């Protein structure tokens, strides 16, 4: 049984049906046949695949009364649906060791590499009072000292000032920090930054994605170099001394000039710090991180090729040799993971054994 779309509502419907089936002693087949009538529920075993001579899928024949097409579930009112404000807190340190609160779902942008920006349409914001309540309740229940406001592009949330003020009113007396990931360099403001610096400063992260304007235009990122440098200037003038920059290697039409442009952009950020930082005694930390482009289904780049592992490693080495400033740290993602991700994301039901093998190999 698989659920297509967003699960907050349909999860409860399936679980309620499962409890009913257990209490009534239904067979597995009867349970699945009934579940298939719920919008968003896909029963793969109820569809017989037919293949083209080249191995691609021709069509699926539904059986057991299953619908010919499964319609994904979309939450229309995020304020009314369940949100876990008392999640299980792990007993060991984890990567995202903080409270996460969703600002809105979807994205007003249209980056051509981004699957999430297309599959989570339309854009649906939460009300400011809902976000503030969920954030405060989560902090109280978990004991975490940091809250992150999540979305595909946090600074595109219009009432962001109101949310920051409401959460900081609770966080500031308790020395808790508030983070805004996924900031866009073209709408980062001093007003937002002044709210964040009321408590201890977290890191600032920008994702230019590509090193040159030509390539950023090609992927529809729509962030200009002057926007990024101005945002960094605002941050450095406000007392920040650390910036993380995220890029992708292997994007369609990418050349070595684009790769070298990443190093040049990092140098420009460093120069901006030297010119505008208010506290140079602490130094500056500029972190450049790259990942390997993965062509994702349901994105405009879904049919693009992925660079070979050797080519990705060559690009990484080229960039490593180009970053010479001691204040700039370069991190890159393991290409093996990106290639597995590409295979799994573009596969069909025949990839099931591969998924199991990947899981067994951790």
Residue ranges and their predicted role:
Residues 44, 50-100:
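N-terminal [4Fe-4S]-dependent radical SAM core
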Residues 2, 41, 81, 106-107, ...:
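Conserved structural-core and active-site-/substrate-pathway-adjacent residues in large, well-folded domains
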Residues 132, 136-287:
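Conserved SAM/AdoMet-binding glycine-rich loop
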Residues 48-52, 158-159, 188-192, 214-219, ...:
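Flexible glycine/acidic-rich beta-alpha junction loops that bind and position SAM and/or redox cofactors
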Residues 89-115, 139, 180, 292-294:
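N-terminal pre-triad scaffold of radical SAM enzymes
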Residues 2, 18-20, 118, 162-168, ...:
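Short secondary-structure boundary/capping segments
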Residues 1-62, 297-348, 357-361:
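Glycine-rich beta-alpha loop elements in corrinoid/cobalamin-binding modules
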Residues 114-130:
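Iron-sulfur (Fe-S) cluster-binding segments and ferredoxin-like electron-carrier domains
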């Amino acid at each position: 049984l698989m659920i297509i779309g967003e699960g907050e509502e349909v999860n409860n419907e399936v679980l309620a049906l499962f409890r009913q089936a257990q209490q009534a002693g239904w067979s597995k087949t009867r349970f699945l046949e009934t579940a298939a009538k719920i919008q968003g529920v896909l029963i793969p075993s109820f569809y017989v695949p037919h293949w083209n001579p080249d191995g691609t899928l021709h069509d699926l024949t539904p059986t057991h009364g299953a619908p010919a097409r499964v319609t994904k579930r979309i939450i229309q009112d995020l304020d009314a649906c369940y949100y876990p404000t008392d999640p299980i807190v792990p007993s060991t340190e984890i990567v995202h060791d903080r409270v996460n609160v969703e600002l809105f779902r979807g994205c007003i942008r249209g980056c051509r590499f981004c699957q999430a920006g297309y599959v989570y349409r339309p854009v649906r914001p939460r009300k400011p009072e809902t976000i503030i309540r969920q954030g405060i309740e989560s902090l109280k229940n978990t004991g975490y000292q940091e809250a992150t406001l999540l979305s595909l592009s946090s600074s595109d949330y219009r009432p962001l000032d109101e949310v920051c003020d409401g959460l900081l009113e609770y966080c500031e007396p308790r020395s808790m920090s508030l983070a805004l990931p996924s900031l866009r360099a073209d709408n980062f403001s001093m007003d937002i930054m002044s709210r964040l610096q009321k408590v201890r400063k977290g890191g600032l992260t920008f994702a230019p994605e590509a090193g040159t304007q030509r390539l950023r235009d090609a992927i529809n990122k729509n962030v200009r170099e002057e926007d990024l440098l101005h945002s960094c200037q605002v941050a450095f003038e406000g007392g920040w001394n650390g910036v993380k920059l995220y890029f992708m290697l292997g994007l369609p039409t990418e050349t070595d000039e684009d790769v070298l442009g990443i190093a040049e952009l990092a140098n420009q950020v460093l120069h901006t710090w030297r010119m505008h930082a208010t506290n140079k005694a602490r130094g500056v930390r500029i972190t450049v991180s790259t990942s390997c482009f993965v062509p994702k289904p349901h994105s405009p780049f879904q049919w693009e090729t992925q660079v070979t592992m050797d080519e990705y490693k060559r690009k990484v080495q080229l960039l490593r040799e180009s970053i010479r400033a001691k204040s700039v740290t370069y991190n890159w993602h393991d290409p093996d993971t990106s290639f597995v991700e590409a295979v799994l994301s573009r596969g069909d039901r025949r990839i099931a054994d591969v998924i199991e093998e990947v899981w067994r190999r951790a």
